[in-house]
From Swiss-Prot:
ATP binds at residues 10-17. Belongs to the IPP transferase family. This is tRNA dimethylallyltransferase. Substrate binds at residues 12-17. It is an enzyme of class 2 (transferase). It comes from Legionella pneumophila (strain Lens). It catalyses: adenosine(37) in tRNA + dimethylallyl diphosphate = N(6)-dimethylallyladenosine(37) in tRNA + diphosphate. The lineage of its organism: Bacteria, Pseudomonadati, Pseudomonadota, Gammaproteobacteria, Legionellales. Catalyzes the transfer of a dimethylallyl group onto the adenine at position 37 in tRNAs that read codons beginning with uridine, leading to the formation of N6-(dimethylallyl)adenosine (i(6)A). Residues 35-38, 159-163, 240-245 are annotated as: Interaction with substrate tRNA. Monomer.
């Protein structure tokens, strides 16, 4: 059991946080967040962080570790997560990684590729092309060269679009080829529990309800406070988090409140679609439909079965 690591993964708004907190009442888990949005301080409402009450009863590692103007990579996540896993196991507990940043899960479990270092000349060329043709043009180019990577990143994620094209221009190989190649993998047994709502309409409705709740709780005011405290720019990695970009553009007068709301909900649904695409191809994952009554009981029973079998063996 010393090398067992449980991973609770799923799309946004599928019920991961509530389930993770419940699991802590049944098993000696310690939670590690796998969420590229929750790492940021002062970004609480829009990232759907666990409540203060939830964090008191179920502490999460890797939440509130970066300022909104800082960046954080998959490589940094792997270093932090592996260090935490080792410490948790040493204490006699079991790591439970919870989140929806599938690129982090993928990097952790399959190892990181040795990618070429950034090349200023190539980056400058891509930035000039973006200025003249637009980032949509570069995203379409990436879709033709590396459709697998393009399907996994947002069309407005300029940093990742640039990096994927940079890798291709430097090596002649696609980023997806690098990421799926053989890499050194950590010495853990990962148990992947995937929340996978079968009805998209159910998930879409939850996403809309949650976005409206965020707006009611002060999401717009949260973004205004970020602008007052930090030199916030729309191209920061933190502002790629769904909802934040749309509210920034609303505050800048680019569109009205209702358009902002519609765009925020649409962006969140697109995120969920990308997360489900990752999950659909995740080999060996145990799938649970989180819209079904009693799905949490099924997961608890499966975890207990796995732990019992591990101890008996």
């Amino acid at each position: 059991m010393n090398k067992l690591v449980f991973c609770l993964m799923g799309p946004t708004a599928s019920g991961k946080t509530g389930l993770a907190c419940e699991l802590l009442t049944h098993f000696p888990f310690e939670i590690i967040s796998v969420d590229s949005a929750m790492i940021y301080r002062d970004m609480n409402i829009g990232t759907a962080k666990p409540s203060i009450h939830e964090l008191q009863s179920a502490p999460h590692y890797l939440i509130d570790i970066k300022d909104p103007v800082e960046s954080y990579s998959a490589a940094q996540f792997c270093t932090d997560a592996l260090s935490l896993c080792a410490a948790i196991i040493k204490r006699g507990n079991i790591p439970l990684l919870v989140g929806g940043t599938m690129m982090y899960f993928n990097a952790l479990q399959k190892g990181l590729a040795t990618l070429p270092e950034a090349d200023e000349a190539v980056r400058k060329r891509l930035e000039e092309e973006a200025l003249s043709q637009g980032w949509d043009f570069l995203y379409q180019k990436l879709s033709q060269l590396d459709p697998v990577t393009a399907a996994r990143i947002h069309a407005h994620d300029t940093q990742r679009i640039q990096r994927a094209l940079e890798v291709y221009y430097l090596t002649g190989s696609t980023l997806s080829t690098y990421l799926t190649g053989p890499h050194e993998q950590p010495d853990y047994c990962f148990v992947n529990l995937a929340l996978f709502p079968e009805q998209r309409s159910w998930l879409h409705e939850r996403i809309a309800q949650r976005f409206d709740a965020m707006l009611s709780e002060g999401f717009i005011e949260e973004v205004q406070q970020l602008q007052a405290k930090w030199p916030i720019q729309i191209n920061l990695p933190s502002m790629r988090c769904v909802g934040y970009r749309q509210i920034l553009e609303y505050l800048a007068g680019h569109y009205d409140y209702e358009t902002m709301r519609e765009k925020g909900i649409a962006a969140t649904r697109q995120l969920a679609k990308r997360q489900l695409t990752w999950l659909r191809h995740w080999e060996g994952a145990l799938f649970y439909d989180s819209q079904n009554v009693g799905f949490n009981t099924d997961i608890i029973a499966k975890i207990r079965e796995i732990l019992d079998n591990t101890v008996s063996n």
